[in-house]
Amino acid sequence: MLRQVPRTLVAGGSALAVAVGVLVAPLATGAAAAPTYNYAEALQKSMFFYQAQRSGDLPADFPVSWRGDSGLTDGADVGKDLTGGWYDAGDHVKFGFPMAFSATMLAWGAIESPTGYSKAGSLDELKDNLRFVSDYFVKAHTAPNELYVQVGDGEADHKWWGPAEVMTMARPSHKISASCPGSDVAAETAAALASSAIVLKGDDPAYAATLVSHAKQLYTFADTYRGAYSDCVTAASAYYKSWSGYQDELVWGAYWLYKATGDATYLAKAEAEYDKLGTENQSTTRSYKWTIAWDNKQFGTYALLAMETGKQKYVDDANRWLDYWTVGVNGQKVPYSPGGQAVLDSWGALRYAANTSFVALVYSDWMTDATRKARYHDFGVRQINYALGDNPRSSSYVVGFGANPPTAPHHRTAHGSWLDSITTPAQSRHVLYGALVGGPGSPNDAYTDSRQDYVANEVATDYNAGFTSALARLVEEYGGTPLASFPTPEQPDGDQLFVEAMLNQPPSGTFTEVKAMIRNQSAFPARSLKNAKVRYWFTTDGFAASDVTLSANYSECGAQSGKGVSAGGTLGYVELSCVGQDIHPGGQSQHRREIQFRLTGPAGWNPANDPSYTGLTQTALAKASAITLYDGSTLVWGKEPTGTTTDTTPPTTPGTPVATGVTTVGASLSWAASTDAGSGVAGYELYRVQGTTQTLVGTTTAAAYILRDLTPGTAYSYVVKAKDVAGNVSAASAAVTFTTDTTGETEPPTTPGTPVASAVTSTGATLAWAPSTGDPAVSGYDVLRVQGTTTTVVAQTTVPTVTLSGLTPSTAYTYAVRAKNVAGDVSALSAPVTFTTAAPPVDTVAPTVPGTPVASNVATTGATLTWTASTDSGGSGLAGYEVLRVSGTTQTLVASPTTATVALAGLTPATAYSYVVRAKDGAGNVSAVSSPVTFTTLPVTSTPSCTVVYSTNSWNVGFTGSVKITNTGTTPLTWTLGFAFPSGQQVTQGWSATWSQTGTTVTATGLSWNATLQPGQSTDIGFNGSHPGTNTNPASFTVNGEVCG
């Protein structure tokens, strides 16, 4: 459940990304040491967590066995398909802002540490998770300047505690647009799509190109129509308000687009916007006392731009931030617990430490400063190890991993309640493998595993994002072993759909009266029962089945009436219908339906021999397996009688099992099927034989079973028994005995055929080869580039062909291929293939001249220019524009937009300006300049007309202050805010303005992007502060010295 206060209450950043092409130094440790923890298993399980968070239509073979389809009507309220995406946390709202941040962080981790994912056997799962969420973002981007950023309502969602599959509350869709801007979420979604495109490009270049196209549009949207999304989408403001503003996302999004496209214009944009990022209070020093999380990404951009450009100002900002987390800055340092946990904030403390750890590890790889390199590396390893169990409690904070892990995460679907109750059942019904909980919220290492504690035990997609990427980095350095049979499908914890019944009164000679209760406690996965039917079976005792009539005194499923139906011989039944009722595990009344019904027959009717009468009492409701329950025509509970004769004959004995595919940890068993002439074979029970002891290891409905998690070099014996529908069990089969391998499969696959190159272009080619064979089966191929004596894996595929991309024109390439089988054995390398890429096409044609610019939104310090777009026929495509200021005979470059519009800022009031524009293509050809546009900025207004709205969120001796300034006048307003604290409060850090405090007087001045407000326009600014125990609001506020209403 998301709290109703912000998770991050500072100006600062939260979004990480790594650039393709950044050269990094070798890992901090020259030779990988044995890992303290099995990082590969933790990474593998973290991928499971993201799968468990999926919304929408899930495939039949989905690895999370207890999840089903959900949210299938998302977007229907606005006529759009908004199915898919991730549920945010333990609730079921799809918040686009943290979802996009989480995707970007995961993509960064894949770009930085693909080998870590490969070693953990999780690269396919990572790509699948990124593609799944990218598909959702593409759906949500319904027009160039339109993006749906939230589905569901937090307040309504949090009032209900049940599984996602059976939600019934309204799920409204919320969007941003040109008239309702959201630069923060639009730029973050652009970053998510651009970074994901980098990861997915090698597998599907066309799909990656689609993601980049959407990312470009979204970034232009974010840059052109500026504003914080939570100002317009107020449904998000109580949960994921953009406290830091959108400046950080403009840097972050531009950087990622640069890495995805190679277009240096985006890098220049990132650097230009960087200079407007938040600073420490009353200082020009970039903020460093917080960290990267869903709201603010500036801390991640410190490291990214440092690694990309090497410029000292970025290096200084990154070092200062990470020093604050490690050794301290100017005597101040993030708080540490006695056990070594870095605790920045009470809500999701482990999340903040994990995010910082990932950046620290990546940044340390790049550094040449030996002291800081070791410091940041060791900090990252230490914080991740703390979460995995290296803490005073010797306990993991990752569900389903390590020693004493959390068992009660604050997660509705994993809990599996059918009563809309956070406490029932007491134990969670599912294991939410891989979920990182919030952990200790104070620097004292204290923690209680309680589902009701939605601070310490909350889980969320953004909690796992940096943590997952850090795990991939540690697997790359230290290794690890993924679990061979993970995940294992969970088995139902009892009856999911059933009928309870009792007698309402003693039977008479003409009727039987029964109280029946249909219950839906399903969670494997949860499901709605909308076509429920119940059959009560009776014997005819010499009369016709139609002589029995059905009636009901009380029914929660509507009127019940009818006559008995013959089932053949002396068997009949009456059917009660709940068709049209939504019986689902969603509450006390929602999960059940009660019917009190009566069967009336001829005089002298004896109910004692009726199959459904067996076991009924007058004392209490009890499960009645002889009263059958159906979903439509499908039997979901109970056993249908087979006439008046009871089946007491067991099935025939199964054949002796045969073991095949024996590996170090598993084997496949199969046997000749049993037969049963009575109620029919229901399935088989497999037993391990150890001396005179037989231990049940599993059941199956097929005459085969796959054994997993065996011990290498160990002898095993098994027998099989058959069981029929009536419950009769056959004799055991003869035993099969085999010994698992000690070193795995000794026969690798055959060597693949020599690759053949085709479709060779200047930047790519297709390779195909004759497939390998072997037993066990071939699972895939590694494609390796050969450079002298060095070979490097550049692609992996499950089919004998691969498409290469991103090659250099006019360059010779050599590749070879090797095969792998399911046991991990690798074949010899194939013979190599060598080919040379084609020369690049030459573009010498300049774009057409742009149209004459048109000035609009002219203010005191800014204006907007638009012009008719250029076209380019030379082949390299239009890359962007250069906007030049004209002063006499001098032309000065002032902006390089990628679209036919630019917002000018920092102009002087009451001053004439002239500008021209020229276009530039991908080959560097430049058009002639356009005709000039001339305009004069407005003079500064001296009498502002405004309103100020002030609100706070307080805790202990701290608080967050939020201020909305609105220009209610008719002319532009360049503002300076002033007020006085009445209770000794102090501003400690602010954002979206330059803050200062002298005594009790506080002053805030606008930044370049929000300093001037047009008529009717608003800006949100804010700060963190301290108070002595009383936090009285200021009496009044001034703008430019005048009292503001």
Curated annotation (Swiss-Prot):
Domain Fibronectin type-III: 653-743, 751-840, 849-940
Chain ranges of the CBM3 domain: 493-642
Signal peptide: 1-33
Region (Linker ('hinge') (Pro-Thr box)): 644-650, 734-748, 831-846, 931-944
EC id: 3.2.1.4
Entry GO MF terms: cellulase activity; cellulose binding
Disulfide bonds, paired cysteine numbers: 946-1044
Entry keywords, A to Z: Carbohydrate metabolism, Cellulose degradation, Disulfide bond, Glycosidase, Hydrolase, Polysaccharide degradation, Repeat, Signal
UniProt GO BP: cellulose catabolic process
Domain CBM2 span(s) in chain numbering: 939-1045
Residue positions of the active site: 91, 410, 449, 458
Function: The biological conversion of cellulose to glucose generally requires three types of hydrolytic enzymes: (1) Endoglucanases which cut internal beta-1,4-glucosidic bonds; (2) Exocellobiohydrolases that cut the disaccharide cellobiose from the non-reducing end of the cellulose polymer chain; (3) Beta-1,4-glucosidases which hydrolyze the cellobiose and other short cello-oligosaccharides to glucose.
Protein name per Swiss-Prot or TrEMBL: Endoglucanase B
Gene: cenB
